[in-house]
Structures are given as structure tokens and as C-alpha cells.
Amino acid sequence: MDLDIEGNVALTTASSSGLGFASAQALVREGANVVINGRDGDSLADAKADLETEAAGDARVVAVEGDITDPDDLDRLVETTLDEFGRLDHLVTSAGGPPSGAFLDTDDEDWEAAYELLVMSVVRLARKCAEPLADGDGGTIVTITSRSVKEAIDGLVLSNSVRMSVVGLEKTLSMELGPDVRANAVLPGSHETSRIRELVDQAIERGEYDSYEEGLADWVDNPLDRIGDPIELGNTVAFLSSPRAGHVNGQAIVIDGGGGSSNL
């Protein structure tokens, strides 16, 4: 399916690896120009090089190093995008997860840091990007959150609680920014990202598993009996960003292979 986004401009955060990278990958394969972001300059440069090998047509990749919890870095990220391309069509927000832990093991600083990372980064970007997105022909926002907003996950009180605000924001944006801008969220379960691979490798080194395949199998928790491929989520993000999903708005879409037990 041609998503009809060739030549569009997409800004993707936390996109030097993981699900943010997979989203940028899917977009650039469709011919969209992408601006990627990350805190580590070396990882960002590697991601840029990888994406450029997959870019369709005349699509360009621009890398902007920065911390999404720093308002000045976010301003520079958006300004660079507009300076480079003169437009913005799609915003894809992603962020690393807050630390795991039980409620009584957290303090005020943990909650404030999680809110800055997961919520305020999206708030600031959406505020900064709303006007250029509306100026185009069908702007979109896709927020990558977690299926923990549907079902609380043991030991992840910060993610379970704070990410709910992101979904509430996304729904509100879908109402307030329409009809010029659509806003949706994707709620991933486990995907075989570099972080998961790292955790499995560490478990093998501790002697918990004999092989990578054995360790990865412990992350499988769905009827499809396999962990997700990051590009499967990336393809969904690209679809939601495209006019092919032109009547999909204000939705929070779980991408977990059917692993959740929630009816809604």
C-alpha cells in the first residue's frame, strides 16, 4: 500500500534506537523526510546512516542531538526541522521508560522526573508543533506510550500512572486541533528492541538462560507466541500518519499481539 507521504516531513523523538527508530524507519521507507533525535551523538549518527540506506526516493534524514526533557533542546529540535524543510507534517513522540519499582520505593523526585520525561516532553512539542502541523495538508501526531495504560504492569507504578496523562492529552489534542491535525496513540507490548536484546544478553551472562532464543521466549506473552518486531509498530505509526488513516483520530491502539486481557 502506498501511504502517500512521499516528500512529507516527520519529526520523531527518541529515535536513535528502539520503537522511535522503527517509526522513523517506516516513514523514510515511504519517502518521508525524517528528523531524528537522541541524547547520544554516536548512536544518533549510526541511526542516521542506517536510515539513509533505506530512504526511498529523495527522502532526507536529519539528526538533532538533544534531551527531550530540556525545553531549550526541544525548541532547537523543532526550529531545525522548520529551517531544514520549511514545513512539518507529522510529529511522532517516543521516550524511554521511567525506572521500575513499587510505589513505596518511589519518591517525589522519581514522580517529577517521570512526568517531565513522559508528559511534559509531549506537551511542549505539541505546543510548538501545533501551528506548523495545522498549516500543512493533514498534520498528524502519534504518541508512542505503553499498553500499561490499559492494564497496570507489576513493578511499573510510574509507567502505569504517568503514561495515562499522555493518552488523556492525545485525546484532547484530537478534539482541539481538529480538523487540521489528527492525534492518535500507540500502546506497545514487548518488542524485540535493542533494550530487550541487551536485557536477554545480560541474563545469559548471569547464567539464567542457555541461549538467546530461550531468554527471548520469556518475553512472549501473547496468543501469537512471538515477540513483536519493532518495524511492525513502526508500520502502524506510518499508517496512522498517512492519509490512508484519514478517519482515525483520538484512538489509543494496542500493539501487543493480543497479549492483554482488557476488553477495551
Q: PLM features: residue spans?
A:
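Conserved glycine-rich cofactor-binding loop
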Residues: 9, 14-18, 40
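Conserved glycine-rich Rossmann-like NAD(P)H-binding loop of the short-chain dehydrogenase/reductase
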Residues: 30-47
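Short, small/polar-rich loop/turn modules that mediate ligand/substrate recognition or access, typified
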Residues: 92, 178-182, 248-250
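Substrate-binding pocket helix/loop in short-chain dehydrogenase/reductase
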Residues: 102-103, 110-115, 218-219
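Catalytic loop of short-chain dehydrogenase/reductase
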Residues: 142-166, 170-179, 189-192
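Short C-terminal tail/terminal secondary-structure segment
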Residues: 151, 237-238, 249-264
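A conserved structural motif in NAD(P)-dependent oxidoreductases
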Residues: 207-212, 221-233
